[in-house]
């Protein structure tokens, strides 16, 4: 009986250790899965690395292109030409509730004005509003090449843009027409100055390409008579003999 009880106690110990190990493994797996779950939920990237098992060159190309995505910013056109909401502006009722449409039209007018504020690469075409404001501030600067543009015109555009995009005041039909008129005037002035500058550069390049006619150079050769040649040779020999005598006398002293 004593040996049987010892055997049963040994079996119980083994079973307890086995069940304890199993419970520990299950708890470890559960905790690990929960940690991975929360880590993936808080992670913004994909659950699997991009380009997994791909060649190194392809993986680098994928990473380079994905890194450019965060720099892509685009301002779409707010109102299309055939937008049904534009018909609401033609109604004779109370148009004050449709002033937001004039705000949208004011921002779209920057795109349709064709002002080349993105031509120098400093103001990309994708960010219309932000770079248009920077362009206006550059025009108002004294060091700008468009100093002839009136500052009052630029101030009108800046105020109209700020009111249409960020302002809380009234921006209705009158404000929009005033803003549109100033925008058209600026576009005309800038295009005229750019056209005159291009014509000036073309004329300067044309002047450089047209080189003046080069007159043929003439070489004049003078031949000495034979008597003068003999005299020059005789004088040279006399001078050489005098130099030799002088060197001999100097060495003897």
From Swiss-Prot:
Keywords: Golgi apparatus, Membrane, Mitochondrion, Transmembrane, Transmembrane helix. It comes from the Eukaryota. One of its GO terms (cellular component) is mitochondrion. One of its GO terms (biological process) is phagocytosis. Coiled coil: none annotated. It is a single-pass membrane protein. InterPro entries: C1orf43 (IPR010876). The chain crosses the membrane at residues 11-31. Pfam families: NICE-3. It is found in: Membrane; Golgi apparatus; Mitochondrion. N-terminal region is required for phagocytosis of Gram negative bacterium. General regulator of phagocytosis. Required to uptake Gram negative bacterium by macrophages. This is Protein C1orf43. It comes from Homo sapiens. The lineage of its organism: Eukaryota, Metazoa, Chordata, Craniata, Vertebrata. The gene is C1orf43.
């Amino acid at each position: 009986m004593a040996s049987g009880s010892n055997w049963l106690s040994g079996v119980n110990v083994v079973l307890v250790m086995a069940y304890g190990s199993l419970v520990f493994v299950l708890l470890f797996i559960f905790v690990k899965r929960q940690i991975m779950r929360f880590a993936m939920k808080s992670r913004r990237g994909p659950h699997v690395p991009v380009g997994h098992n791909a060649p190194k060159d392809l993986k680098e190309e994928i990473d380079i292109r994905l890194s450019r995505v965060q720099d892509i910013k685009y301002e779409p056109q707010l109102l299309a030409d055939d937008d049904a909401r534009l018909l609401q502006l033609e109604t004779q009722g109370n148009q004050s509730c449709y002033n937001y449409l004039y705000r949208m039209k004011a921002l779209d007018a920057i795109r349709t004005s064709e002002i080349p504020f993105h031509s120098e690469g400093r103001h990309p075409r994708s960010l219309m509003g932000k770079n248009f404001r920077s362009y206006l501030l550059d025009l108002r600067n004294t060091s700008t090449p468009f100093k002839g543009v009136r500052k009052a015109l630029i101030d009108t555009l800046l105020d109209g843009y700020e009111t249409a995009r960020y302002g809380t005041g009234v921006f209705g039909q009158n404000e929009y027409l005033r803003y549109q008129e100033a925008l058209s005037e600026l576009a005309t002035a800038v295009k005229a100055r750019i056209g005159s500058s291009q014509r000036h550069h073309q004329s300067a390049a044309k002047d450089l390409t047209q080189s003046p006619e080069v007159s043929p150079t003439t070489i004049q050769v003078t031949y000495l008579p034979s008597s003068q040649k003999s005299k020059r040779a005789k004088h040279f020999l006399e001078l050489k003999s005098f130099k030799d005598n002088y060197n001999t006398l100097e060495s003897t002293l």
